A protein has these predicted regions:
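Solvent-exposed, polar/charged alpha-helical surfaces in well-ordered, non-transmembrane soluble domains
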Residues: 1, 19, 23-27, 32, ...
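Ligand/substrate-recognition segments at binding pockets and active sites
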Residues: 81-156, 169, 225
Length: 251
């Protein structure tokens, strides 16, 4: 989910309030509910920017927001109050069903309900056809984009942590939401050429910790891999390569 309220082109532009709104949202999201009730455990909660199973993965969002993975209205209320944000916050939440599937309607109806818990947000849930959606979401030199908060999915081009960072957080990224953080940008460049696995893993964790504070995006769910095999079939392996390994399968 991409979040950019109170952006530079908005009439009430305020960086501190914008960050508080993002952090309040992060405190209210219940990923377990989305994974179990909407997707029947075909997705799992994601509390990091690098998926579980890849180098550098760390559940930074779980520690920073909510109560150990569960939502916290009290924390959300406090962060908004401390920033001087008047509640309820009017928030337009955009999603797309023809590209991301019919379950998106149920997912974002649940998110709307979660965000409105405690009366902190008033959410206007909207759906747009994909071609228009993909145009309207981006930031240009004249606009912060038409959608303050919107759905965005991702399937990696290759199985490496960098493919979950560079496309989202480097300057000139494909998300094109106007986000820029020099420290994060420099660290992403650094990890891409590190050959020491332990050193790179630490750099990757540092990037996630910084982004957990910025919250230019809020990860929600990670796809779960599933294989069905007979009881007499052994050696079925599912891993971060996203490839089914026939060489290990025996009967």
């Amino acid at each position: 989910m991409k979040i950019q309220p109170f952006g530079e082109s908005q009439p009430n532009a305020d960086a501190n309030k914008a960050k508080a709104v993002r952090q309040a949202v992060a405190n209210l999201i219940d990923r377990d509910e989305l994974a179990t009730k909407v997707y029947k455990k075909t997705y799992t909660p994601m509390y990091s920017y690098i998926p579980d199973g890849l180098a550098g993965h760390e559940d930074t969002l779980k520690a920073a927001y909510g109560e150990n993975g569960k939502p916290s209205v009290d924390k959300a209320r406090k962060v908004l109050k401390d920033a001087g944000v008047t509640t309820p916050v009017d928030l337009k939440l955009q999603y797309n069903g023809d590209h991301y599937g019919s379950s998106s309607a149920d997912e974002y109806a649940a998110i709307k309900s979660q965000l409105e818990e405690g009366g902190l947000f008033s959410v206007d849930l909207q759906q747009t056809e994909w071609t228009q959606y993909n145009k309207d979401r981006v930031v240009t030199k004249d606009s912060d984009g038409a959608y303050p908060v919107y759905q965005l999915g991702w399937f990696p081009d290759y199985s490496d942590p960098d493919n979950y960072l560079s496309p989202f957080f480097r300057d000139g990224n494909f998300v094109n939401n106007g986000y820029s953080n020099k420290e994060i940008n420099d660290l992403i460049v650094k990890q891409a050429v590190q050959t020491d696995e332990n050193a790179r893993a630490e750099t990757l964790k540092q990037i996630q910790r910084l982004e957990t504070d910025d919250l230019s995006t809020i990860p929600l769910l990670q796809g779960a891999q599933t294989a069905v095999a007979g009881s007499n079939v052994k050696g079925v392996v599912l891993d971060a390569s996203f490839r089914f390994r026939y060489s290990s399968v025996t009967k």
